Amino acid sequence: MSVDKPDFMALWNRYLTLAAGDKAALRKVGEPDELREFHALYSLFPNGRAHDGWLRLAFLLPWCEDCGEERREKCPKLGKLLAAGAVNEMRLFQVARAKSPNDIIQFRRLMIQLKHPTLNWDEVASLLYRSEHRPSEPANTWAWSGKAKRQIVEDYYLAKFTPAKGDK
C-alpha cells in the first residue's frame, strides 16, 4: 500500500488566490491554532479539516515565496538560505529543541528575518508537514517531527561549512 504525497503546490496556489484581507489575517495570527478562527484557513482547505501539519504550513505561507517550477531543481535548500541569511545558529537550535507550538512560532520568526525567502515550497512544506506523536503529550496532539527539524539543522551546517566551488 502506498501513501500519496500531499499536494503542497496546490496549497500554495490556493494561497495565491486568497483575497488581500485573508492573506493579512494569516500574517496576524500569533500561533497556528488561532488560524481556526479565520475564514482564510477554510479557503485554503475546502475539502476537509486542517490537521496540525497543514496548520504549520498555513502559518508560514505569508512569509515565503515559491521559486517557481522552472527554478525548482536549482533552488537552494532551506539550510543554505538560513546560513546565507546570517541566521544565528543558536536561534536554529532553539527551534529544533522547542516543543509545539513554540517551535513553529520561532521558525516563522526566522522566515520573517530572512524577509520573504524564495525557496522550493514543495520541499520546505514536506519538512514542515511531517508530524510525530510524543508519548508525553495528549493522544490527539501531533507535533512537528524532530527528524525534520534535525534535517534543517544539518542542512544549515552543511551549507555553512561546505566551501564554495573554487574555495580551498
What would you call each of these model-derived segments?
Residues S2, P6-L60, C64-K168:
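Basic, alpha-helical nucleic-acid-binding regions used in initiation and control of genome expression
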